[in-house]
Amino acid sequence: IDLMSYNQLLRKKSLPRATYVFTDFDRIDFWTRELAAKAYRCLTANNARALNDPASARTRLPMLKKLQGEGLNSFSVWDAEMDGLPDRYPVFLRTRAAHRGTQTELLTTPEEARSALDELVRSGLCLSDLMFVEYCAEPIEDGLFRKLAAYCVGDEVITGMSVHDENWHAKYGKEGVASEAHYLDEMQ
């Protein structure tokens, strides 16, 4: 596997025959995404295998809404700009773009949600980039949380690396908190 940035891809005059997987649309601006979509079309027009069309792939908020609507996700999400405050709690605020993780602790009331949203906007985060996410996770045992990840590549689901943490927000994990049995359980 070779990694190539969009900056590198869009500067190439020719590309080797390969399978190209377009990802991380929440990390690029609109114009780069549009150019990536044109590159995708050039690749497929020349019989190269390309996955995840930048022109039609959903970004975080629309994808989460779709998965929830299809019953695949049990939690809801709300666009802070368009949907207003959540109607279920607890929630947390995060950005739609980038991989910054949560921007707040768990918010349990509309008042806490409004106050946190106002504070993030005052700090310089754009309202149009903020979303509320309903928190539904439960610890796998007392004081231990696990985050799992999976990716679809074509028709194949590939599991990503899991992390374990003592905090509800298990983004990076904490070394030594999970046992070998926890990791073996994931392989079932």
Outline where the language-model segments fall.
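Conserved N-proximal alpha/beta basic substrate-recognition cap immediately N-terminal to
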Residues: 1-90
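Short, basic/glycine-rich phosphate-binding loops at helix/coil junctions
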Residues: 19-20, 96, 180-181
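Pocket-edge structural micro-motifs
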Residues: 24, 52, 95, 134, ...
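Short catalytic/ligand-binding loop motif for oxyanion handling, primarily in non-cytosolic enzymes
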Residues: 29-30, 59-61, 99-103, 141-142, ...
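Flexible, glycine/proline-enriched loop segments at strand-loop-helix junctions
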Residues: 53-54, 101-107
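Alpha-helix N-cap recognition
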Residues: 81, 109-112
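ATP-grasp fold ATP-binding core
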Residues: 85-103, 125-142
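Phosphate-binding site of ATP-dependent enzymes
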Residues: 111-188
